[in-house]
């Protein structure tokens, strides 16, 4: 039982580190979203999303398979995109970049 408790504590530590990193990533995404809005660029950038997913799959050494890594990062990217849209909607201006129709 001591080993289980030790491993669970380690998971708790890793979870806290993940939360910190995810929030740091979200702050970067928000800053990028602001720059996109200033440049009149749409929130959704499919080529960039493809690059991000390819990068994390290349970095993956398991035990999670590439499909699992892809699903996790697709969710992270979706949340970043949602934050970008929310932030753009709160800023004064026409919000043209935030309202751009997305295409896959």
Describe each PLM feature range.
Residues 1-104:
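Domain-level signature for soluble enzymes in the chorismate/prephenate branch of the shikimate pathway
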């Amino acid at each position: 039982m001591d080993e289980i408790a030790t491993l669970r504590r380690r998971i708790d530590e890793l979870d806290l580190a993940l939360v910190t990193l995810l929030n740091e990533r979200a702050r970067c995404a928000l800053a990028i979203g602001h720059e996109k809005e200033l440049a009149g660029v749409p929130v959704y950038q499919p080529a960039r999303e493809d690059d991000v997913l390819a990068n994390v799959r290349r970095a993956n050494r398991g035990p999670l398979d590439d499909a699992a890594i892809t699903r996790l990062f697709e969710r992270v990217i979706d949340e970043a995109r949602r934050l970008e849209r929310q932030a753009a909607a709160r800023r004064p201006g026409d919000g043209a970049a935030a309202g751009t129709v997305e295409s896959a």
